[in-house]
């Protein structure tokens, strides 16, 4: 799961799929070699604005796929596709052009935090709102809308 997802997106995912998926929180961004780890003002070692909420909702278990895994959903950048189980269909939600986009069986181009609104809860527990700086490109959708649509499909498909 994306540690850049908003509180609202993470909660929507949990409500829709938390009981159906084994969920693993990933760091979408890592500190670059030579980059300052942290300071006493602005720089934090965790480069992911909502990892705290993601871990509260989904835990911090290391990535491990069960042998019976039959579907993988990857949300956001930073996933190592080489670690995904072979031969298992992959749904990928990503906001950026990346080689992995073409390896997914289903790809959804999603918005960045600059194109949507929501809330993050930081490392200290403070919740802050963010708002769009500009509109989404044609064909781009918010991850929350994807999760809501897939959840609706799941309800309709259940006898």
What does each model-identified segment do?
Residues 2-159:
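Non-catalytic alpha/beta scaffold blocks inside enzyme catalytic domains
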């Amino acid at each position: 799961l994306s540690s850049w997802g908003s509180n609202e997106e993470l909660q929507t995912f949990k409500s829709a799929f938390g009981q159906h998926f084994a969920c693993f929180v990933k760091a979408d961004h890592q500190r670059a070699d030579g980059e300052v780890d942290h300071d006493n003002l602005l720089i934090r070692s965790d480069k992911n604005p909502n990892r705290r909420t993601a871990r509260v909702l989904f835990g911090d278990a290391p990535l491990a796929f069960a042998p019976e895994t039959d579907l993988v959903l990857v949300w956001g950048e930073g996933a190592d596709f080489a670690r995904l189980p072979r031969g298992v269909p992959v749904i990928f939600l990503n906001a950026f052009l990346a080689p992995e986009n073409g390896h997914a069986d289903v790809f959804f181009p999603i918005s960045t935090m600059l194109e949507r609104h929501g809330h993050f809860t930081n490392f200290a527990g403070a919740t802050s709102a963010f708002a769009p700086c500009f509109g989404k490109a044609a064909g781009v959708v918010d991850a929350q809308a994807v999760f809501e649509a897939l959840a609706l499909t799941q309800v309709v498909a259940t006898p």
